[in-house]
Design a protein with these regions (language model features):
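Extended ligand-binding regions for polar small-molecule ligands
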Residues: 1-7, 45-57, 116-122, 128-130, ...
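A mature extracytoplasmic/lumenal domain signature
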Residues: 26-28, 66-69, 103, 114, ...
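Acidic, polar ligand-binding/catalytic clefts
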Residues: 48, 52, 56, 61-125, ...
């Protein structure tokens, strides 16, 4: 995709890929991480594409390490099994991993199924409504603070949430809009509500204790942003709901 960052330090390479390969943690169902191309069957997404680009620049092999959801990816990183991922950069997560500067920002919203009477954000917080969130996600921690009357229902991942909609176990699902739009593509008649309940700031995450790599990582992010590589990756991933980095 682009030339290697000039004068890449061996210390940074060793810090980012200590096993001689870049182990990229990803989970299915979100174009932010990885989704399956309906035409080719190939797995791709922002995390996968940026991980491949960084591995290329480091001149090390790329290795995909798959999990079911972001909480498992971050647990794998904390355990030393993952070198690189892309995640919402929250203060809670920053206690366990190190983040680059913001890559992109994403709107947070709600998905409703076909024929839902819910038309706008003020309709969401009503007694009896069941709002799905991904187990271990930032949304799981935030939505209960925003909604006083609706019931929050954890789901293993986006695929399980779609199944829960089919069984009429959910009335809405809350997460970032790229994931919601990806889900809506698989649910005829489903809608992503207008407006947002928050914004996620997405950054590259690496394990704590690899400070020798942070300057290299900062330059990598800066270069993919200014060169157009990030824009290309966002378009290739089909990310919708992207707003200016905050």
């Amino acid at each position: 995709m682009g030339p290697p960052i000039a004068a890449a330090a061996q210390a940074a390479r060793e810090a980012l890929a200590p096993r001689g390969k870049l182990r990229v943690g990803a989970f299915p169902g979100s174009p932010l991480s990885m989704v399956r191309d309906r035409g080719t069957g190939e797995m791709h997404g922002l995390c996968i594409d940026l991980g491949k680009e960084l591995a290329k620049r480091l001149d090390v092999p790329f290795e995909q390490v798959s999990y079911q959801r972001i909480a498992e990816v971050l647990a794998g990183m904390k355990a030393g099994d993952v070198d690189f991922t892309v995640s919402n950069a929250t203060p809670a997560r920053a206690a366990d991993v190190s983040f680059s500067q913001t890559l992109i920002s994403l709107e947070l919203g709600y998905l409703v199924p076909a024929a839902s009477p819910i038309a706008s954000l003020p309709d969401v917080d009503k007694p009896g409504l069941r709002v799905g969130v991904t187990q271990g996600s930032t949304s799981q921690g935030t939505i209960p603070k925003l909604l006083r009357n609706a019931t929050v229902v954890p789901a293993q991942n986006a695929a399980r949430a779609i199944e829960m909609f089919e069984r009429r176990e959910l009335d809405l699902f809350a997460t970032n809009k790229p994931t919601l739009f990806e889900m809506s593509d698989q649910m005829p008649g489903a809608r992503v509500l207008e407006g947002r309940w928050g914004v996620e700031n997405i950054a590259v995450a690496i394990p704590r204790g690899r400070e020798a790599a942070m300057e290299y990582l900062r330059r990598f992010v800066e270069e993919v942003q200014t060169s157009g590589l990030l824009t290309q990756a966002v378009e290739r991933a089909g990310l919708r709901g992207v707003v200016q980095a905050q």
